[in-house]
Amino acid sequence: WYSSMFAANIKQEPISHHHHHHHAHHSHHADSNSNASSPHQSPLPSPNPPSNTNLQLEQYLKQQQQQQQQHQQQQQPMDTLCAAAMTPSPSNNDQNSPLMWSGLPNPMQTIMPANMRPSPTAATAATTTELCAPTTTTAAIALQANDKLQALTPPMDVTPPKSPAKSQQSCAEPEKEHDLMSNSSEDMKYMA
């Protein structure tokens, strides 16, 4: 998904680079301070996206990277859709991102952990809704699946490395909680 997102950005970047070039240049100094709240800096309809898009995109990317490591197939369809739907926002802001990173490091560092700690799902869902409304349903489904998968991941990780007897003990309780898991992990243990 990473490469698809960047490929899409790179394809669009030369286009937006040309008609953005002078604009970005002459507003570099004027807007470097007020950039977060300057609507004309960004071609997007609403005044917020220049800061929100990058801020939330950063959150979104970090979360996607974490989730991706755990279950790639689950993530793939959503990433592709979101990358396609989101590409216009990040790529239009690409020229501005140097300003953004310098203008926003503090809000980003404070807001991100705050948002991600209490409920990553809510943060991602909000981000997804704002950045690519069409894929909200897909995102919501994938997020629910992610939650299940993340809940099921620990027993899964425990089962294969240990001997069948040990893994049966260590997994007995999680299996009671996770009906979905119990069938497959018991099969694995008895097969092993």
From Swiss-Prot:
<protein>
    <recommendedName>
        <fullName>Protein hunchback</fullName>
    </recommendedName>
</protein>
<dbReference type="GO" id="GO:0003677">
    <property type="term" value="F:DNA binding"/>
</dbReference>
<comment type="function">
    <text>Gap class segmentation protein that controls development of head structures.</text>
</comment>
<feature type="compositionally biased region" description="Basic and acidic residues">
    <location>
        <begin position="173"/>
        <end position="192"/>
    </location>
</feature>
<comment type="similarity">
    <text>Belongs to the hunchback C2H2-type zinc-finger protein family.</text>
</comment>
<feature type="compositionally biased region" description="Low complexity">
    <location>
        <begin position="32"/>
        <end position="41"/>
    </location>
</feature>
<keyword id="KW-0217">Developmental protein</keyword>
<keyword id="KW-0479">Metal-binding</keyword>
<feature type="region of interest" description="Disordered">
    <location>
        <begin position="152"/>
        <end position="192"/>
    </location>
</feature>
<keyword id="KW-0539">Nucleus</keyword>
<keyword id="KW-0302">Gap protein</keyword>
<dbReference type="GO" id="GO:0005634">
    <property type="term" value="C:nucleus"/>
</dbReference>
<feature type="region of interest" description="Disordered">
    <location>
        <begin position="16"/>
        <end position="54"/>
    </location>
</feature>
<keyword id="KW-0677">Repeat</keyword>
<keyword id="KW-0862">Zinc</keyword>
<keyword id="KW-0238">DNA-binding</keyword>
<keyword id="KW-0863">Zinc-finger</keyword>
<dbReference type="GO" id="GO:0035282">
    <property type="term" value="P:segmentation"/>
</dbReference>
<dbReference type="GO" id="GO:0008270">
    <property type="term" value="F:zinc ion binding"/>
</dbReference>
<feature type="compositionally biased region" description="Basic residues">
    <location>
        <begin position="17"/>
        <end position="28"/>
    </location>
</feature>
